[in-house]
């Protein structure tokens, strides 16, 4: 086991899911990098001791990366979550940005300069089918990293969300182990729903409600009965499979950057509904309540949903980092 404090930097840090998880594993995350101003704002609020750099990594010269190295100093770990939208099946048939896909190679450039003992690269599972994926692996091998490829579903590590992601676990020691299988009681979506009355409901069958919404709700009610709450699912690959709804006794479907889950519950005047709110999505990602999101000024509800949808589940990164360090 590594006995000294592990120092890390977080590339494409977003709101800080990877950093939050690594911190829970005992890591000192000393710097975060992202180009979205609102992600930077959120990251700064939650990691006040870290240096935070708003920059487009693809536009950095090698000399500028060396200057970052001089400023930050030696590190032991790089966390990297390159752009994933253009790999994801959630993109559908929309045009793909090939240049954005190349952000994965920025992790290699930073590793070449910083030479950390370990590196974790996280992305959607479709990342593996990218035509440059083999080139990425070869670049890592050239830097003498042993690379372990693993797919982890967050629901299997105690997160109340089904979120499957690919992790590349990289180690210079020739050892890189994925988290050991554990028996974890699956957490249902019901655990993240706020029933305090804080959020406003509207009638399910109010005038103007979309027919597809009503039809999905009726399918759920036909299965569950009139007295059971459920979730409507908008957009995404899981919508068709689940016929537009899901039980709250199952982990939440995958959170994306879209507003895609509505909570429906019976009332004295018939079923009422509301969209899940960012603070609920935060809990469904595995963040603890003390992580700042709604309290940060200048962010719209849409911004907060996007920050969560683009994020990494902290408990997963905690397990990944602990396993990597323990075995390397």
Language-model features: where?
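Conserved class I S-adenosyl-L-methionine
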Residues: 6-12
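Class I SAM-dependent methyltransferase "Motif I" SAM/SAH-binding loop
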Residues: 12-15, 308
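Conserved SAM-binding loop of SAM-dependent methyltransferases across substrates and taxa
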Residues: 15-27
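The conserved SAM/SAH-binding core of class I Rossmann-like methyltransferase domains
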Residues: 32-33
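Conserved SAM/SAH-binding beta-strand->alpha-helix loop
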Residues: 36-37
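S-adenosyl-L-methionine
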Residues: 41-70
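Class I S-adenosyl-L-methionine
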Residues: 63-77, 84-254, 273
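C-terminal target-recognition/interaction regions appended to catalytic cores
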Residues: 215-328
């Amino acid at each position: 086991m590594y006995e000294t404090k592990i120092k890390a930097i977080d590339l494409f840090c977003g709101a800080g899911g990877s950093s939050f998880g690594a911190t829970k594993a005992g890591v000192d995350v000393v710097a975060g990098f992202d180009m979205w101003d609102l992600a930077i704002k959120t990251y700064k609020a939650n990691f006040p001791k870290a240096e935070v750099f708003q920059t487009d990594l693809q536009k950095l010269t090698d000399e500028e990366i060396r200057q970052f190295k001089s400023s930050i100093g030696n590190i032991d770990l790089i966390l990297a979550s390159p752009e994933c939208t253009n790999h994801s099946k959630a993109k559908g048939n929309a045009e793909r940005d090939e240049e954005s896909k190349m952000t994965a190679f920025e992790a290699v450039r930073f590793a070449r300069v910083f030479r950390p003992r370990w590196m974790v690269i996280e992305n959607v599972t479709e990342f593996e089918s990218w035509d440059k994926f083999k080139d990425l692996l070869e670049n890592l091998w050239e830097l003498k990293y042993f690379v372990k490829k693993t797919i982890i579903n967050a629901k299997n590590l105690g997160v109340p969300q089904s979120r499957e992601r690919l992790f590349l676990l990289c180690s210079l020691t020739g050892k890189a182990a994925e988290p050991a299988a554990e028996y974890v009681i699956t957490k249902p979506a019901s655990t993240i729903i706020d029933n305090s009355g804080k959020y406003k409901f509207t009638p399910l069958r109010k005038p103007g409600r979309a027919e597809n919404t009503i039809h999905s709700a009726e399918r759920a009610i036909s299965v569950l009965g009139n007295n059971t709450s459920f979730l409507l699912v908008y957009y995404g690959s899981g919508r068709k499979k689940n016929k537009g709804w899901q039980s709250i006794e199952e982990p939440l479907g995958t959170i994306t950057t879209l507003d895609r889950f509505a909570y429906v519950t019976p009332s004295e005047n018939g079923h009422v509904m509301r969209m899940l709110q960012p603070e609920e999505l935060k809990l469904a990602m595995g963040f603890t309540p003390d992580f700042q999101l709604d309290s940060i000024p200048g962010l719209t509800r849409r911004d907060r949903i996007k920050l969560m949808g683009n994020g990494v589940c902290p408990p997963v990164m905690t397990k990944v980092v602990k396993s990597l360090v323990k075995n390397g």
